[in-house]
Regions:
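Phosphate/ribose-recognition catalytic cores of enzymes acting on nucleotide-derived substrates
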Residues: 1-171
Length: 171
């Protein structure tokens, strides 16, 4: 799997933009149920391939399911300290209302910016409030012209053989 040379993104995070493509797998089952904020999760195999310099934390960008419309997204990368996860995860909340789950679908994501580091929370309410603030901040950030351009990036229309996970950076 090729990983292209990294560059410094406009907001200072190395290795961005980061382009990810993989199958949506079942997560921990808490996004929709406990938090009311559904997420699409990448496989452990894909998570293990992300660049080491991508720190744990909350990111924003664009996402598309099964080559459908491109929507804003916010993504948590890390160990989710509140839940004391034993495995690193990438959980993508797509800012769009879907009528049903889409496990097994192909998810394409372009990670563009960093919002905050991963942290622990004292309560579930505090966690949900932080996630809602992340969603609002991501929504506002993606209205910037330099980020809006990525909504129509060729990555979202590339015809790539099914079943191939992709992690790549572009200069």
């Amino acid at each position: 799997m090729p990983v292209f040379p990294s560059k410094l993104s406009p907001n200072g995070v190395k290795c961005l933009p980061l382009f990810l493509r993989g199958t949506v797998v079942k997560g921990f089952g808490r996004g929709s149920k406990q938090l009311g904020i559904p997420t699409a999760n990448f496989s452990q195999e894909l998570v293990s391939k992300i660049p080491a310099e991508l720190d744990c934390g909350v990111y924003y960008g664009w996402a598309s399911v099964n080559d459908g419309p491109v929507n804003k997204m916010v993504m948590s990368v890390g160990w989710n300290p509140y839940y004391k996860n034993e495995k690193k995860s990438m959980e993508t909340h797509i800012m769009h209302k879907f009528d049903q789950d889409f496990y097994g679908a192909m998810l394409k994501v372009v990670v563009l910016g960093y919002l905050r580091p991963e942290k622990n929370f004292n309560s579930l309410d505090e966690l949900v409030s932080a996630i809602k603030a992340d969603i609002q901040n991501a929504d506002e950030s993606l209205n910037r012209e330099e980020w809006r351009l990525f909504k129509s990036h060729k990555f979202f229309t590339e015809n790539i053989a099914n079943g191939i996970d992709i992690v790549r950076q572009e200069t």
